[in-house]
């Protein structure tokens, strides 16, 4: 293993109240799957909010359900995306008209059928002013997991297309992110919010050599590949997990159902 590698530090501070995020600049992408219960909190963290095509339907329909004692119109005005981008084959006309009326930028890329809607949104963020300090940028994608498997596979592929950009795929149950082989990794665990179940998975390229610390079943110069050993259903044991590998790996960890604030809005 290459002990001289730079260390990349990972933290799910976006699951904490906004005053505890340590300067990270977040962008949020909402895809066309059920919204996690903590979506309003992610929204408050984000400096830029995009809906990928039908993700706008989810914001319009589902966010008011998180605030049953407030007027849905008020909620829809509070949570307006900055940009709607995609091939525009899923967004409803009434939803599109609503957000256009209230000033959301709409980018129709129906001419591009070679990239996914998530890919289109990531590209937009990478070319935005938010990416001027790229080391501090983290992109959060909700609705990236669940539903059709080919959609999930396409979203996982986006992580590999942009290994130099910190992207986290989120569902109500877990998160997934890429650990590039170019770095050693320190993953800081918020045990009240996430875990204990976790996994390290090589996709595309086998790992001949992976070493970890902080897991119940640590790896020590271990080979991992599909058709052989992969580290699934592992358990977090320490507050800091370290990972070093000769291959890009996917890191996944469960998100607990309790302990998370549903929203961080201050009227």
From Swiss-Prot:
Which function does this protein serve? Answer: Catalyzes the phosphorylation of thiamine to thiamine pyrophosphate (TPP). TPP is an active cofactor for enzymes involved in glycolysis and energy production. Plant leaves require high levels of TPP for photosynthesis and carbohydrate metabolism.
Q: InterPro entries given for it? A: Thi_PPkinase, Thiamin_pyrophosphokinase_euk, Thiamin_PyroPKinase_B1-bd, TPK_B1-bd_sf, TPK_catalytic, TPK_catalytic_sf
> Under which name does UniProt file this protein?
Thiamine pyrophosphokinase 2
NCBIfam families recorded for this chain?
thi_PPkinase
List the thermal properties of the activity.
Answer: Optimum temperature is 45 degrees Celsius.
Q: Tell me which GO cellular component terms the UniProt record holds.
A: cytosol
Q: What happens when the gene is disrupted?
A: No visible phenotype under normal growth conditions. Tpk1 and tpk2 double mutants exhibit a seedling lethal phenotype.
Top-level taxon of the source organism: Eukaryota
The reaction(s) annotated as catalysed by this protein in its Swiss-Prot or TrEMBL entry are: thiamine + ATP = thiamine diphosphate + AMP + H(+)
Q: Does the keyword Transferase apply?
A: yes
Enzyme Commission (EC) number = 2.7.6.2
According to the UniProt entry, its GO molecular function terms are: ATP binding; kinase activity; thiamine binding; thiamine diphosphokinase activity
**Coiled-coil annotated residue ranges, if any:** none
